[in-house]
Swiss-Prot record:
Catalyzes the synthesis of the hydroxymethylpyrimidine phosphate (HMP-P) moiety of thiamine from aminoimidazole ribotide (AIR) in a radical S-adenosyl-L-methionine (SAM)-dependent reaction. This is Phosphomethylpyrimidine synthase. It holds the Pfam family ThiC-associated. It catalyses: 5-amino-1-(5-phospho-beta-D-ribosyl)imidazole + S-adenosyl-L-methionine = 4-amino-2-methyl-5-(phosphooxymethyl)pyrimidine + CO + 5'-deoxyadenosine + formate + L-methionine + 3 H(+). Keywords: 4Fe-4S, Iron, Iron-sulfur, Lyase, Metal-binding, S-adenosyl-L-methionine, Thiamine biosynthesis, Zinc.
């Protein structure tokens, strides 16, 4: 089977809609602005509408051909603004894809390269003197279609929530603590514009990624999650990475970073970008390092600049740039338990020490801003000196870099370049809030984007759990996007199942943070599932969960028959001791007698007391034995 057919076969595995779900759309002010949602139809006739990141892959009626890529949603919007130009772009060079491959790979890789070349569209860039960033438009009072799209997406369909959020006393009791965030009851396009203009939110949307469905990352919006994919020098293929992308967005990844460090970096990225409805981020220094044979000391500004333009032309939406790793800070890591653990950070530290000067990234930061604003690539200012163990959390190296990132944020904003700040890492629970406080203090409310943090270091194989604890906390405190951690963290490259486990763990963390912040409507899905649980609507419980497949599988391990899907008990308590069944019986008893539940409980207790006395007052009663 040739490579494209293999890709098509892989993707067919994840094209099924979720159970009882269908795609619906919120219509914007123009015919080409349609925001996808996932609607779950419940067995009681209700419909629950959910935020959807899966793109067209879960819509059965849409034909998907990975060799052609997804529809270009934003092309009409880009054309109307008339501030970009299509040009020839740089030529794809052999160096872009790294070292020569083994002979057994050559034919397959060459076919993938040819198909990827067909996928790549002629690139756009800003016209001379123009700035095409969403921040630039926002600061001029312009509401772009991307901003309206974000507003509709953040609000979703609110009608179904009224039943669950209409009890004013309960809502007052359960109201969240936004921890200083200013979350509106309804997100308007103008609110999105204002948040982007202030730098408190970004809309990562490169003009060369027209397939992207716009989304926002910001403290006053829903907490988002990022999933990492990418090949390495020792394992994984282009096909596997495209499949991981589709798999990741199925389970709820809002953004995906391609962290490829091995061969075929450019070609892998072509396949990913043209088939991605979510923003794609990269760490450009990884590819630049491949271009110099892995020797950090041989990196130059010219090579790095060429790599930035290469990736911007392909459509990468945000770059992790380790501009805060400065020569004066490197010695601060000498006494650490685990030193410098960031790959990008260690590359730049080695370069700085070798040349005994500030990094070319720091020195050329304004030149980088010129590239970013020509394509609307967002900065993700990397935490190259983040702590790699709890023992190193909140040290001077970490916070010295953070202060520098705050300074660079203001430089980026001078150019109207959208910017977010990356954060740790490994931080014990009692030290997490200090990270958020320091970031807000020094980085001027630019969105915070954290890897976890992991709260303990003794959980290899379970680091997705150890980090989801920290992620939920820092998400509540104000982090805008959480970078997932998989069970393979610190151990190996994640496979398909690891990706799912990491995403589900982080969807839990992000949702818990939204509920704690009191985000409007965040708790409605919980209430809908709780209602289904109380009414023993098992299929609805499964289908409203973050992972319907696992929920159903666990239930069916002990009660596999279809009849069990309508049973008023589960295998935990059995039919006689189900607390919810007992509660329902009390309510039925009260309704039959026209009394309150409290009165029913009192009457029931009196009845049982009378039966106890009539039976002789014995605690233990011998069972009747059938001698027949």
């Amino acid at each position: 089977m040739n490579a494209p057919d293999k890709l098509a076969t892989l993707l067919s595995l994840t094209r099924e809609p979720f159970p009882a779900s269908r795609k619906s759309y919120l219509q914007g002010s123009r015919s080409d602005l349609r925001v996808p949602m996932r609607e779950v139809t419940l067995t009681n006739g209700e419909t629950v509408s959910l935020y959807d990141t899966s793109g067209p892959y879960t819509e059965p009626g849409v034909a998907i051909d990975v060799r052609r890529g997804l529809p270009s949603v934003r092309t009409p919007w880009l054309d109307e603004r008339a501030d970009t130009e299509v040009y020839a772009g740089r030529l794809h060079q052999a160096l872009d894809d790294g070292a020569k491959h083994e002979d057994r790979e050559a034919e397959r890789i060459e076919q993938l390269r040819l198909d990827a070349a067909a996928l790549q569209r002629p690139p756009r860039r800003a016209r001379a003197g123009a700035n095409v960033t969403q921040m630039h438009y926002a600061r001029r009072g312009i509401v772009t279609p991307e901003m309206e799209y974000v507003a509709l997406r953040e609000n979703g369909k609110r009608e179904w929530m009224r039943e669950y959020l209409g009890d004013a006393p309960r809502e007052q009791r359960l109201r969240g603590n936004p921890m200083g965030a200013q979350i509106p009851a309804i997100v308007t396009p103008e609110f999105v514009r204002d948040e982007v203009a202030r730098g408190r939110a970004i809309i990562p949307a490169n003009i060369n990624h027209p397939e992207v469905e716009p989304m926002a990352i910001g403290r006053n919006f829903l907490v988002k999650i990022n999933a990492n994919i990418g090949n390495s020098a020792v394992t994984s293929s282009i096909e596997e990475e495209v499949e991981k992308l589709v798999w990741a967005i199925r389970w709820g990844a809002d953004n995906v970073m391609d962290l490829s460090t091995g061969r075929n970096i450019h070609t892998t990225r072509d396949w990913i970008l043209r088939n991605s409805p979510v923003p794609i981020g990269t760490v450009p220094i990884y590819q630049a390092l491949e271009k110099v044979g892995g020797v950090a000391e041989d990196l130059t500004w010219a090579i790095f600049r060429d790599t930035l333009i290469e990736q911007a032309e392909q459509g990468v939406d945000y770059f992790t740039i380790h501009a805060g790793v400065r020569l004066p800070f490197i010695h601060l890591t000498a006494d650490r338990r685990t030193g410098i653990v960031s790959r990008g950070g260690s590359i730049m530290a080695k370069w700085c020490i070798s040349h005994h000067r500030e990094s070319f990234i720091y020195e050329h930061f304004e030149d980088i801003c010129d590239i970013m604003k020509a394509y609307d690539v967002s900065f993700s200012l990397g935490d190259g000196l983040r702590p790699g163990s709890a023992a190193d959390a909140n040290d001077e190296a970490q916070f010295a870099e953070l202060r520098t990132l705050g300074e660079l944020t203001q430089v980026a904003w001078k150019h109207d370049v959208q910017t977010m700040i990356e954060g740790p890492g490994h931080v014990p629970m009692h030290m997490i809030q200090a990270n958020m406080d320091e970031q807000l203090k020094h980085c001027h409310e630019a969105p915070f984007y954290t890897l976890g943090p992991l709260t303990i270091d003794i959980a290899p194989g379970y680091d997705h759990i150890a980090s989801a604890i920290g992620a939920a906390m820092i998400g509540w405190f104000g982090t805008a996007m959480l970078c997932y951690v998989t069970p393979k963290e610190h151990l190996g490259l994640p496979d398909r199942e690891d990706v799912k486990q990491g995403i589900v763990a982080y969807k839990i963390a992000a949702h818990a943070a939204d509920v704690a912040k009191g985000h409007p409507g965040a708790r409605a899905r919980d209430d809908a599932l709780s209602k289904a649980r109380f009414e023993f609507r098992w299929m609805d419980q499964f289908n409203l969960s973050l992972d319907p497949d696992t929920a159903r599988d666990f239930h069916d391990e002990t009660l596999p028959k279809d009849a069990s899907k309508v049973a008023h008990f589960c295998s935990m308590c059995g039919p006689k001791f189900c607390s919810m069944k007992i509660t329902q019986e009390v309510r039925d008893y009260a309704a039959q007698r026209g009394v309150s539940e409290a009165q029913a409980l009192g009457a029931g207790m009196a009845e049982k007391s009378s039966q106890f006395r009539q039976a002789g007052g014995e605690i233990y009663i011998p069972l009747a034995v059938d001698k027949g």
